[in-house]
Regions:
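General beta-strand structural signal in soluble alpha/beta enzymes
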Residues: 2-4, 31-35, 63-64, 97, ...
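PLP-dependent aminotransferase class I/II
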Residues: 70-137, 142-145
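Conserved PLP-binding catalytic core of the aspartate aminotransferase-like
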Residues: 15, 124-133, 138-172
Length: 174
């Protein structure tokens, strides 16, 4: 099994899932991707890095959170082939000994998925805002790591300087 994040949380790097799938096919391996930092806003319809890289049918297990972009307070999901999910339900100790999600979180999460299926307006707006922010920060002279992800690393290269920036942002209510 090859396991990767779809998008990496520290810098927004998007995994080359198409190449990972090719590697998995060469070695007859499964592919699992954690979409916690991609579900809802990466890919044309927000289905994450598998959609973004054009490999939806080639990823065997997808995990994600109902928090972050999807707005839930807790919980997550694992999706995959029926046989894999049945095995995980039987053998995953954390699953066996955990509590179920509150019905309100499940209901709200279902509505978010429905909303994302019906329109890309919010996702498109986030993409536009991210592009604007990246361009504006670059124009202002900041070193921005290239990418399309809404996680936008601003490279300051010195911890004391980063602390000063953080303090100033807090002072301004940001």
């Amino acid at each position: 099994i090859i396991v990767t994040d779809g998008a990496f949380s520290m810098d927004g790097t998007i995994a080359q899932l198409d190449k990972i799938c090719e590697l998995a096919e060469h070695y007859d391996a499964l592919v699992m991707t954690d979409e916690c930092h991609a579900s809802g806003f990466i890919g044309k319809t927000g289905r994450g890095v598998p959609e973004y890289c054009g490999v939806i049918g080639r990823v065997d297990i997808i995990t994600g959170t109902l928090g972050k972009a999807l707005g839930g307070a807790s919980g997550g999901f694992t999706s995959g082939h029926k046989e894999i999910i049945e095995l995980l339900r039987q053998r995953s100790r954390p699953y066996l000994f955990s509590n179920t999600l509150a019905p309100s979180i499940v209901g709200a999460s279902i509505e978010v998925f429905n909303m994302l299926s019906e329109t890309t307006v919010l996702r498109d707006k986030l993409e536009q805002n991210t592009k604007y922010f990246r361009e504006s920060m670059t124009t202002a002279g900041f070193d921005i790591k290239p990418g399309v992800h809404p996680i936008v690393p601003i490279m300051l290269y010195e911890a004391p300087l980063a602390q000063k920036f953080a303090e100033r942002l807090l002072d301004k209510g940001i």
